[in-house]
Amino acid sequence: YADQIDKAIRRAESAGSALASNLPIGGTAVGTGINTHPEFGAKVAQRLTEALGISFAEADNHFEAQATRDCVVEASGFLRTVAVSFTKIANDLRWMGSGPRGGLFEIALPAVQPGSSIMPGKVNPVICESAMMVACRVQGNDLAIALGGTGGVGSLLELNVAMPMMADALLDSIGLLSATADMLVDRCLMGLEPNVPVIAVSYTHLTLPTKQAV
C-alpha cells in the first residue's frame, strides 16, 4: 500500500508537470500570436514561476496547445490512476475491517459515527466508502475531460470550446483527491489497529496444511 501511494504521489506530480510545461498563452486566438509581443508568453510563464514556485513554460507549439488540450487529458489520466489506487486501498481496508462476527475482522477501523443497533460491535466503514465514492467521481470527471478533448465535442478545428468544463472537472478532481487523502489518514489510518488474536488464528489455520504436508 505504501509503495502504491508513493507511485500515486509521483503520478500527481507528473500531472502538474504536464500542465505547467504547456502553457497556451501568447498565441492569441488560434495560435498565430498575431498582434502579441513575441516574448509575451515566455515572460508570463517566468512571472508565474516566480510567483508560485512552480516551473511554468510556454507551449512550444501554440497551434497544438490551443486546438487541443491533450495535456489536460493526460493530467486527468494520472489523477484517475490515483483514484483507482485509493479505491483498491479503501476497499481492502473495508473488507479487512468487516465483522466482528460475520467478516474478516483482521483490523479494527476507528468508529466515526454510531454503529448499527441490530449488529452490536459493527463499525460502519464510512471513511473507506467515502473515499471509494470520491474515486468514482474522479473517474467520471476523467471521462468528461476526455470527451472535452475529443474532436466534435470540445476540439473543433483550431479551437477547443470545452476548456471551461475541462478545467472545472480537473480542479474538482484535484480538490476531491487532496481532501480524501487527508481524510483517510486523519479519520481512518491514524486510528486503525490490528486485531492480533484474529490474525493469529487465521495464520494458524492457513499454515496448518503446510505443517501437515511436512
Regions found by a protein language model. Name each.
Residues 1-145:
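Internal glycine-rich alpha/beta core junctions
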Residues 41, 45, 198-199, 206:
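Hydrophobic packing and interface segments
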Residues 94-99, 103, 108, 146-152, ...:
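Short alpha-helical "patches" and their helix-cap loops
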Residues 107-118, 155-162, 199-203:
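Short, mixed-charge aromatic SLiMs
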Residues 137-200:
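Long, amphipathic alpha-helical stalk/connector segments used for oligomerization, subunit docking
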